[in-house]
């Protein structure tokens, strides 16, 4: 039975002349993808109409995996193989990840970035993030009807070089061309500014699942200038969950170390649900039955929760004060405060922001979607889809100073924090000893004065310096930061012209060979993924055809004689029985049989409709 496909207004594929690009918010708790369609940025939903994809991946044996909602629902029954909040691990070693000791995972000793052992092998945070990004890419291509030319992916403003590079590697592994990495508060400002025609000084308070950012922006006639940025890449909604989790355990006289991993995950899920419920209700219940048979039942009031998390709320105000000082403005100068991130729905956060800035925060845009919407606008522009009203300029900044190690383990800052990017700065250095023919250059990031207190980004050597007395050689070191906030360093000896350079790829243990291996692994599972996709498509088409045929039989079953009706009923029953199975070829064959078996029925229905439409009308009226 042939179908006529009609798109809802605004849901048709983009015109062929537009280059399809999307904005992706790769979040700690949830992720989403957005695109500009008919000049309006919108979040793209999945088949069930949900725009948020839980940032959860469950690994199964034999290469299987669950991603998003399905994985989240199974986290409590298989916590060791279900990776949540992976964004906290990006570009980080185990010692740098807060709460790693309480996580249910088996961590693997590896240089640099932490690794997690699963039933499907050892996985890096880059691989886990790539699964999420690939799912969003597929959603976008299915919705938009064509391949993507690229994506703008958002990152916390306070992400350092290692975390940014890890994000780009994950995108590359997911088959995405990264047009730009965009700071999340800046993306929110783009969405808010363009949507509201806002001008003046604005603060963007971004509290997500695992990170906190505070940016001060100046919006003037299409120019988005970031004046200062601050934050904490290890503070987010997850920390509020863990505080409440510890409180519930303490009230019950239990310790986390004594719980089974399944119970830890289950209780964390219940606690998170209670936290979210407290945003709308004065109290919430936590009811859990542990694997030991013990039951926990507690009532949490909003006041109790507010008192419990007050230290975390105050932690967000420290970077806020610092950013205001860096921008040389006061809280009274701020015209509006834009809230970003699901954690900002908590009344305790909104009350604290309102009190600090002396005004209620702006909440007219969905805090879960605003970052992705802004990224979509930037992606559309970078893809070349410029229209008359798109003449605007984005001036972003680097969140942390970039420097070089000098004698004594000191840091000489080359590019100070809050410098507008892209940017290049140079400084001259000299040799320390007579006859010195080489110089080791150690690139660091941070605000501290000692190298040991900053993050090491890269090391390289400049060799071939002509032997001279100490202090005679002149070595010019140039730091260059691109629009993604990623760094390249060049060194040149001025007398001889010898030079060396490095594109900083942080030492988190993921090299080109690792990327190649991961890509090869993804190719190996591509056939399995395609088979799963084909089966799902066959099941959906079968269900659609069964429902359409049954509706037609109810409306016009009298057009068939008893024998014909029996044949159609048998075809419908056969397809309905096969549809839930896992044989895509059999489902396709049954679908084709039903479609062909109802062709004559469809023709009779068409004749009936035409006769009904023409009944009582004269020839000259037609």
UniProtKB/Swiss-Prot annotation:
InterPro entries xrefs: ATPase_NBD, Heat_shock_70_CS, HSP70_C_sf, HSP70_peptide-bd_sf, Hsp_70_fam, ISC_FeS_clus_asmbl_HscA
GO MF annotation terms: ATP binding; ATP hydrolysis activity; ATP-dependent protein folding chaperone; unfolded protein binding
Example of a GO biological process term: iron-sulfur cluster assembly
Keywords assigned by UniProt, alphabetized: ATP-binding, Chaperone, Nucleotide-binding
Transmembrane segments: none
Pfam family, one: HSP70
PANTHER family: HEAT SHOCK PROTEIN 70KDA
NCBIfam families on file: HscA, PRK05183.1
Function noted in UniProt: Chaperone involved in the maturation of iron-sulfur cluster-containing proteins. Has a low intrinsic ATPase activity which is markedly stimulated by HscB.
Name of the featured protein: Chaperone protein HscA homolog
Native source species: Burkholderia pseudomallei (strain 668)
Source organism phylogeny: Bacteria, Pseudomonadati, Pseudomonadota, Betaproteobacteria, Burkholderiales
């Amino acid at each position: 039975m042939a179908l006529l496909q009609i798109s809802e207004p605004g849901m048709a594929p983009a015109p062929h002349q537009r280059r399809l690009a999307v904005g992706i918010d790769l979040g700690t708790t949830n992720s989403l993808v957005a695109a500009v369609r008919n000049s309006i940025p919108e979040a793209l939903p999945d088949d069930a109409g949900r725009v948020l994809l839980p940032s959860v991946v469950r690994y199964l044996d034999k290469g299987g995996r669950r991603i998003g909602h399905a994985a989240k629902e199974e986290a409590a029954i298989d916590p060791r193989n279900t990776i949540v909040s992976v964004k906290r691990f990006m570009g980080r070693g185990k010692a740098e990840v807060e709460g790693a000791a309480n996580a249910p995972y088996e961590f693997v000793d590896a240089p640099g970035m932490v690794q997690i052992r699963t039933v499907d092998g050892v996985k890096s945070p880059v691989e886990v993030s790539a699964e999420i990004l690939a799912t969003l890419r597929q959603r976008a291509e299915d919705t938009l009807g064509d391949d993507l030319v690229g994506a703008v992916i958002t990152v916390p403003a306070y992400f350092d070089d290692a975390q940014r590079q890890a994000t780009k590697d994950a995108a590359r592994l997911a088959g995405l061309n990264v047009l730009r990495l965009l700071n999340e508060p800046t993306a929110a400002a783009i969405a808010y500014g363009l949507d509201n025609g806002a001008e003046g000084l604005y603060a963007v308070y971004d509290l997500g699942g695992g990170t906190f950012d505070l940016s001060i922006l100046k919006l003037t006639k299409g120019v988005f200038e970031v004046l200062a940025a601050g934050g904490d890449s290890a503070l987010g909604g997850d920390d509020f969950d863990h505080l409440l989790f510890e409180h519930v355990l303490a009230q019950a006289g239990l310790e986390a170390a004594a719980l089974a991993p399944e119970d830890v995950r289950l209780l964390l899920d219940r606690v998170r649900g209670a936290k979210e419920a407290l945003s709308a209700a004065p109290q919430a219940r936590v009811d859990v039955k542990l694997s030991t048979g013990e039951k926990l039942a507690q009532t949490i009031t909003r006041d109790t929760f507010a008192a419990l998390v007050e230290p975390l709320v105050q932690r967000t105000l420290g970077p806020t004060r610092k950013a205001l000082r860096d921008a040389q403005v006061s809280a009274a100068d701020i015209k509006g405060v834009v809230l970003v991130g699901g954690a900002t729905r908590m009344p305790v956060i909104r009350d604290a922001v309102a009190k600090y800035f002396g005004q209620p925060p702006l909440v007219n845009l969905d805090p879960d979607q605003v970052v992705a919407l802004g990224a979509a606008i930037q992606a559309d522009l970078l893809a070349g889809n410029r229209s008359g009203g798109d003449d605007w300029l984005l001036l972003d900044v680097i969140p942390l100073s970039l420097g070089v190690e000098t004698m004594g383990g000191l840091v000489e800052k080359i590019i100070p924090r809050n410098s507008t990017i892209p940017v290049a700065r140079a400084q001259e250095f000299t040799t320390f000893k007579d006859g010195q023919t080489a110089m080791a250059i150690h690139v660091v990031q941070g605000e501290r004065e000692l190298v040991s207190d900053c993050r090491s980004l890269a090391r390289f050597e400049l060799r071939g310096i002509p032997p001279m007395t100490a202090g005679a050689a002149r070595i010019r070191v140039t730091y260059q930061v691109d629009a993604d906030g990623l760094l390249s360093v060049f060194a040149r000896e001025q007398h001889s012209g010898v030079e060396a350079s490095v594109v900083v790829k942080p030492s988190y243990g993921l090299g080109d060979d690792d990327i190649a291996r991961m890509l090869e692994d993804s190719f190996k599972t591509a056939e399995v993924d395609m088979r799963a996709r084909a089966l799902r498509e066959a099941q959906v088409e079968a269900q659609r055809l069964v429902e359409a045929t049954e509706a037609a039989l109810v409306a016009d079953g009298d057009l068939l004689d008893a024998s014909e009706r029996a044949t159609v009923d048998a075809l419908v029953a056969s397809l309905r029985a096969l549809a839930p199975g896992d044989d895509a070829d059999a489902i396709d064959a049954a679908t084709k049989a039903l479609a062909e078996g109802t062709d004559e029925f469809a023709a009779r229905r068409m004749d009936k409709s035409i006769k009904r439409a023409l009944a009582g009308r004269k020839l000259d009226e037609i």
